[in-house]
């Protein structure tokens, strides 16, 4: 379990280390190094998702480690309450930023091993705090 403390309340995550071991280990590495301390959810789109993990309170981008392989084809779907890695147009570019799905977002799921179909890797789920 991972605890995210925000100004609005706490969010508890359960990671899917069985199906997405590289992605879960990547996220835990950032957690254990206190990388996420004093970061914020900088992208909030009601009815879609909230994204965080890359910017500090001054809206400055934090330096990250190398990217992690996209394990979306092994993971779960982008449903309400799932936690997925944010990335650029490169399917294997995820580093520290992640998002919580506020709705079922099937269009973000894996569909093919190409740039358009790789999707966004779900590596966990919110088990407490979706209501904050």
Tell what function each PLM region has.
Residues 1-132:
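Cyclophilin-like peptidyl-prolyl cis-trans isomerases
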């Amino acid at each position: 379990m991972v605890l995210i403390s925000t100004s609005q309340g706490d969010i508890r995550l359960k990671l899917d280390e069985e199906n997405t071991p590289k992605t879960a280990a990547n996220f835990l590495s950032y957690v254990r190094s206190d990388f996420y301390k004093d970061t914020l959810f900088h992208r909030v789109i009601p009815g879609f998702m909230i994204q965080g993990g890359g910017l500090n309170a001054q809206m400055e981008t934090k330096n990250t480690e190398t990217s992690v392989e996209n394990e979306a084809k092994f993971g779960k779907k982008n449903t309400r309450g799932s936690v997925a890695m944010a990335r650029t147009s490169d399917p294997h570019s995820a580093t520290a930023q992640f998002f919580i799905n506020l709705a079922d977002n099937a269009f973000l799921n894996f569909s093919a091993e190409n740039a358009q179909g790789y999707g966004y890797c779900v590596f966990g789920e919110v088990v407490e705090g979706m209501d904050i």
